Amino acid sequence: MYKIVRAEELTTNIYLFEVEAKRVAKACLPGQFVIVKMDEKGERIPLTICDYDREAGTITIVFQPVGASTTKMKELKAGDYFRDFTGPLGNASELVEEDIEELKKKKILFVGGGVGAAPVYPQVKWLHEHGVDADVIIGSKTKDMLILEKEMEAVSGNYYPCTDDGSYGHAGMVTTMVEELVEKGNKYDVCIAIGPMIMMKFVCLLTKKLGIPTVVSMNPIMVDGTGMCGACRLHVGDEIKFACVDGPEFDGHLVNFDEAMKRQQMYKTQEGRAMLKLQEGDTHHGGCGQCGGDE
């Protein structure tokens, strides 16, 4: 059992839990994720790690309720327990694998959208702790929907909040902020984009035009987190990948976002899953119990 030591509603319908999970906290790196289960019969829910404290043995997760399980999960309080808290899973961010001295020579840009700010934060924090300060753009619909602002400002080289309605920071989409920074003479060596798939798609279209290599995190399409259900199958160039086992990070300029978004929508219905099985044959390997493909 894994105890929730802190439970907080960051903003409307976005929640933060800090959970005691010493083994995970000891081993995890930025970019990885965990799978949680509330009880023995509960669904497996993949969530990207937002922060970790190795000394305290805790992991911080941030989530937005979108279905029955996460809606039930938001009712948990400090002192409650998760039955399972499995991780760390997936591959760590490419940045943490690079030589620190080489990283210090690079100008790095992060672009996050909505709850995507949560997986951006541990990467920016890790870089800051190693003497590398990155520029960070975080977008949301309104000021009230921005999360982790104080934390992000503390570890960013420059922090640029954006709101669609212009209520705070830069007025407009994150892509217009990227353009503005480049027009001011910023020459970025790499961009890391994490957020809704439609946001990542348009960031990648822009950065490809600007000649900025871009990494995206495809965690939004994960369902069971083991590769068994096939929900996170996607084309990266000419190759078929699974976000939960091969990623979650990929070259954003090679990801087929239109296909990934279409598959994400189809997996929400039994008819859609049946069509995918007909089209792709062995996409679903059975046994995950999450996507309905065993029915």
Regions from the PLM with identified roles:
Residues 1-80:
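Ferredoxin-reductase
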Residues 1-30, 39-41, 96-107, 129, ...:
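Iron-sulfur (Fe-S) cluster-binding modules
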Residues 6, 51, 161-163, 216, ...:
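Structural signal for conserved beta-strand scaffold positions within catalytic alpha/beta enzyme cores
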Residues 39, 87-88, 237:
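Short, surface-exposed secondary-structure boundary micro-motifs
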Residues 42-51, 89-100, 244:
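Short, Lys/Arg- and Gly-enriched loop/turn segments at beta-strand edges
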Residues 71-223:
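FNR/FR-type flavoprotein reductase catalytic core
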